[in-house]
Amino acid sequence: MSTIQLEAQSRTDMGKGASRRLRRLENKVPAVIYGGSKKPMAIHFSHNKVIKALETESIYSSVFDITVDGKVEHVILKALQRHPYKPIVLHMDLQRVSSKDILVKLVPVHFINEEQSPGIKAGGIVQHTMTQVEIRCQAKDLPEFIEVDMSKVGMDDVVHLSDLKLPKGVQLTVDVTDGSHDAPVVSIHAAKVSSTELEETPEVPASAVPTTDQGESAE
């Protein structure tokens, strides 16, 4: 579970007009909590605190706590509506979860120890094909991210989905056992010399080649 904690207040005013007033006059973010055995609940957050929380990567893929009128709810972020060009959060949808709920989530992939990779040390170029993967697990087992250790990845090596070391209780949502869905996650390849670079290679003029008295090139 993430260490993120947010405080919210319940609200009774509903509708677009009420939401606009919250945003414009009170600098609040309207939101809704739904799911579980409870009824949906309309709430609002401090906009400044929401903006700060959204700077934390784990809020998008982890279970976190919110306190509503003194009562704690365990939730995941289901939807986030932003202003098209202003740094303003317009609305949030949150889903209640219990520790045994089965969740399907996209979680980020972190590539660690790249500076130790033999392939990179040899001048190879890293290609990150995937930066997030979809997993299935109980809420209590939901990781904030999946790590890929690059310390032993060499030149022309490819790390596939089947190579990922998943935490206990966590599964990929795709079946990689038969190889047909075993997509590459990251690879290292030698840098290619472009045709432009080859064309720009200076030629040695004939006058620069030493010759003998007979006009033949010196060996």
From Swiss-Prot:
CDD domains in the cross-refs: Ribosomal_L25_TL5_CTC (cd00495)
Key words, A-Z: Ribonucleoprotein, Ribosomal protein, RNA-binding, rRNA-binding
SUPFAM superfamilies assigned to the protein according to its UniProt record, in alphabetical order: Ribosomal protein L25-like
InterPro entries on file: Rbsml_bL25/Gln-tRNA_synth_N, Ribosomal_bL25/Gln-tRNA_synth, Ribosomal_bL25_b-dom, Ribosomal_bL25_C, Ribosomal_bL25_long, Ribosomal_L25_dom, Ribosomal_uL5_bac-type
Pfam families, per database record: Ribosomal_L25p, Ribosomal_TL5_C
Any one GO molecular-function label of the UniProt entry: structural constituent of ribosome
Compositional bias segments (type: Polar residues): 209-219
A GO cellular-component term linked to this record: cytosolic large ribosomal subunit
Gene3D superfamilies: Ribosomal protein L25, beta domain, Ribosomal Protein L25, Chain P
GO BP field: translation
Function: This is one of the proteins that binds to the 5S RNA in the ribosome where it forms part of the central protuberance.
Entry's family note: Belongs to the bacterial ribosomal protein bL25 family. CTC subfamily.
Protein name: Large ribosomal subunit protein bL25
